[in-house]
From Swiss-Prot:
This is Elongation factor 4. It holds the Pfam family GTP_EFTU_D2. GO terms for molecular function: GTP binding; GTPase activity; guanosine tetraphosphate binding; ribosome binding; translation elongation factor activity. Gene3D superfamilies: 3.30.70.240, Elongation factor 4, C-terminal domain (3.30.70.2570), Elongation Factor G (Translational Gtpase), domain 3 (3.30.70.870), P-loop containing nucleotide triphosphate hydrolases (3.40.50.300), Translation factors (2.40.30.10). It is found in: Cell inner membrane. It catalyses: GTP + H2O = GDP + phosphate + H(+). Belongs to the TRAFAC class translation factor GTPase superfamily. Classic translation factor GTPase family. LepA subfamily. It is a peripheral membrane protein. Its main location: membrane. GTP binds at D14, H15, G16, K17, S18, T19, N131, K132, M133, D134. Keywords: Cell inner membrane, Cell membrane, GTP-binding, Hydrolase, Membrane, Nucleotide-binding, Protein biosynthesis.
Length: 602
């Protein structure tokens, strides 16, 4: 046990985390040279393309240190994005050490800081590493100062490396051996293992990635999940060196996989504790208490996904079910919209998660989708005191029946160079933000705001990047539900509500947003044979109106001269025809209209 080192790598997107992992695996001979490919641990195409890691992966490596001993290094690759923060915290709690990789040419970024604090809270030893030292613009001294200022850990011994050229990799491995503590666990205690991650393999079922904390699990033993109580038999265990290697047992302190013929991912929840099912003569029986930190993940952002062709509904459901096999945090339920037909209401962890799910549906399953505006969950207290959760604007009860609406508030940390503080503060105030704190760290500034999640969901991130020329970064965490004066704005076409176009906004912005959406619709919906009235309404109050004028034929073209009554007769006849058409005609709402709501400028 003293020769095991479990560590992970914390880094911002594109600071070289996966490249460093590749180098470490290569140095320890985890894969033959012919199997080495760039970003070995990122197995999904979309992970490689976006340069992000979504699912955790591991590699168990043997390293012969300078002191002549052989150490088992377990590298646990973590996702780096704030949407996947729960998965990050589980990956980190399975480690005793973490390499904090900072791009020497860019300095510290928000996501890194958030994950680094998570690591420090969990008592993980953090070793700073400066990457990209081969670049001419690398500035190690500033980067070290930033690490000390922003994160508050000693960076004087930060290791200078270049993952691309392979410089300094041995120093990193030596530091891991020297500074990362060995796992603390009792091999003679009842089995307790934590699920770090789980994914679905179409051949063997669910594969669980676990960190054994106490005791041991042998092949063929029956174990149970402490959160759900379900029991299974361990058909196959082993470790990844990234390639799969079977073993007969997993011991305390090790990180490996268990395959137990589980059919669905919901059964193997990330963060759950595994223990033995019952006491037998040759084992120590089940543990009494679970490992701390397990929680059910709640989706924060909802959107409707509809197939463009009605006959693609079943295909979309199959695609979502397949995605859910590998993504337990994706929720969906069937939904019917008058405007868009049959589809699904999907729940996501955040905006990146939503984009990735959409992109995977389009890319891996060839789906053509219509996506409605993302919305958040509101707590609504009805007149009779009943509290309901509303995740879809069209489900919001009538104004008269509502006592109060509470919206989700999040704490947002914004990091940026000090030149951009002004514009960023203006943006946060526009979004109804309340400033809580402001700290200067050298040239970097950290602003802390409380903002309604509903304001962040639409376009806050894009705006933040544009006002700060891409330098600002953010992370957020849910704080509480708070009473707020929000209203539902409906869009009516010729007096008919279009449910998929409803939005929930703060009353102070409702007039403006209603007008903007109506104006946008007027540009998008094509002219019909009759007048189309586009109205925005709150309850029964119309707050904005635009009219799309009818196309009309010049019925007077064939009258030369002649009496006015003759012309009037023809015009009246045309008018009556248009009126009749308006009663029976319906307006086609093009696909762009649903997306236009997202782009209404504030």
């Amino acid at each position: 046990m003293n020769h095991i080192r479990n560590f992970s790598i914390i880094a911002h997107i594109d600071h070289g985390k996966s490249t460093l992992a590749d180098r470490i695996i290569q140095r320890c001979g985890g894969l033959a040279d012919r199997e080495m490919e760039a970003q070995v641990l990122d197995s999904m195409d979309i992970e490689k393309e976006r340069g992000i890691t979504i699912k955790a992966q591991t590699a168990a490596l043997q390293y012969k240190a300078r002191d002549g001993k052989v150490y088992n290094l377990n590298l646990i690759d973590t996702p780096g994005h704030v949407d996947f923060s729960y998965e990050v915290s589980r990956s980190l709690s399975a480690c005793e050490g973490a390499l904090l990789v900072v791009d020497a040419s860019q300095g510290v970024e928000a996501q890194t800081v958030a994950n680094c604090y998570t690591a420090l809270d969990l008592g993980v030893e953090v070793l700073p590493v400066l990457n990209k030292m081969d670049l001419p613009q690398a500035d190690p001294d500033t980067a070290k100062a930033e690490i000390e200022d922003v994160i508050g850990i000693d960076a004087s011994e930060a290791i200078a490396i270049s993952a691309k050229t392979g410089m300094g990799i041995d120093d990193v491995l030596e530091q891991i051996v020297a500074k990362v503590p060995a796992p603390r666990g009792q091999s003679e205690a009842p089995l307790r293992a934590m699920i770090i991650d789980s994914w679905f393999d179409s051949y063997v079922g669910v594969v669980m990635l676990v960190r054994v904390v106490d005791g041991r699990l042998q092949k063929g033993e029956r174990f149970k999940m402490m959160a759900s109580g379900a029991a299974y038999e361990a058909n196959n265990l082993g470790v990844f060196t990234p390639a799969q290697q079977s073993r007969d047992a997993l011991e305390a302190g090790e990180v490996g996989y268990i395959i137990a013929g589980i059919k669905e991912l919901k059964a193997a929840k990330v963060g759950d504790t595994i223990t033995l099912e019952k006491k037998l003569p040759n084992n120590l029986g089940p543990a009494t208490e679970a490992l701390p930190g397990f929680k059910e993940i709640q989706p924060q952002v909802f959107a409707g996904l509809y197939p463009t062709e009605a006959n693609q509904y079943d295909a979309l459901r199959d695609a979502l079910e397949k995605l859910q096999l590998n993504d337990a945090s994706l929720h969906f339920e069937p939904e019917v919209s008058q405007a868009l037909g049959f589809g699904f209401r999907c729940g996501f962890l955040g905006l990146l998660h939503m984009e990735i799910v959409q992109e995977r549906l389009e890319r891996e399953f060839d789906q053509d989708l219509i996506t409605t505006a993302p919305s958040v969950v509101y707590e609504v207290v009805k007149g009779d005191g009943e509290v309901i959760m509303v995740e879809n604007p069209s489900k919001m009860p009538d104004q008269g029946k509502i006592q109060e609406i509470r919206e989700p508030i999040v704490t947002v940390h914004l990091y940026m160079p000090q030149d951009y503080v002004g514009p960023v503060m203006t943006l946060a105030n526009q979004k109804r933000g309340v400033q809580m704190n402001m700290q200067y760290h050298g040239r970097q500034v950290m602003l802390t705001y409380e903002l309604p999640l509903g304001e962040i969901v639409l376009d806050f991130f894009d705006k933040l990047k544009s006002v700060s020329r891409g330098y600002a970064s953010m992370d957020y965490e849910f704080k509480e539900y708070r009473p707020s004066d929000v209203v539902k704005v409906d869009i009516l076409l010729n007096g008919e509500k279009v449910d998929a176009l409803s939005i929930i906004v703060h009353r102070s912005q409702s007039q403006y947003r209603g007008r903007a959406v109506a104006a946008k619709m007027r540009e998008i919906i094509s002219r019909q044979m009759f007048d189309v009235a586009i109205q925005a309404a709150i309850g029964a109050n119309i707050i904005a109106r635009e009219t799309i004028k009818a196309l009309r034929k010049n019925v007077l073209a064939k009258c030369y001269g002649g009496d006015i009554t003759r012309k009037r007769k023809l015009l009246e006849k045309q008018k009556a025809g248009k009126k009749r058409m308006k009663q029976i005609g319906s307006v086609e709402v093009p696909q762009e209209a649903f997306l236009a709501i997202l782009q209404v400028e504030d």
